[in-house]
């Protein structure tokens, strides 16, 4: 009897040990599921931020391309009028007249092609309805919505289900609405001005700087110096950030004595061209670049200005909402995930809590330098974090 009793006790002990082991394995598996779900949700949010960074860079490049297109059309029209006028003067120089005629025809064809291309490209890039920029901005909004409660819960639910059919996981609600205010669409003028400054810094020198040059001719003047050609050109963005304008002019300037003083004035416009994208004004409004030195050429450029209304101004990017961030240099966004395993009865359910955060850090292989967080470089990552006291308290309200 004693041996039989010991055998029964041994079997019961083995069963208890087995069930305890099974429970420990199940609990650890649920903890791992919660960690995986939290990290997956945070990773998705990091990818959303990185998408914003990539799309913001694409939008900036798109704005640069529009500025380049406007500048190219203006310069092509300027070169067309310059070569056409040169060909007219070539009638007085028979040996070079055929060459100047061919150059003028080629320039006219190039200007025609540039206008036709810009008429398609600028609306395709900047149209407020179906432009590439608008599509990128809409994609940013869709991605942002996917990182909110419903979309994020779909991620955690799929991760939990892949771990075990009886596992469920969801993101705990954030009473501070930290993620909702983590980023925001630029709306204020100062926000758009910052984007415009970044875009203009990305322009090549030919577009960003005034295109000014003084060319001395062999024609003497009574001022004891030579007559000169004055080239003036500039590409500008209007103060309201809604219109691009580019102008190029070249005029012959006459120097003469007047009341014992040497004076200079525009005598003959030789080349001119202008283009605008946005609000159609058919007039040169730029005040920079010394365009006033060639008033006649400037007026002719405005009268023949290429115009397209298929542009709605500098883009409104989605950026970090610095006003709502506790740390504006290295902000992070937390989330907490609670996982549950159903075992039939409500009292037999198991629960697990895990937290993760999204943070900004340059990759290990990048040059060693300090870089503050932004939505222009895709360096957002995710990692697990220790649940906070507030998250633990909130999780207790979810347990039944």
What spans do the regions from the language model cover?
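Alpha-helical assembly-interface signal, strongest on the long, hydrophobic N-terminal helix that forms
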Residues: 1-74
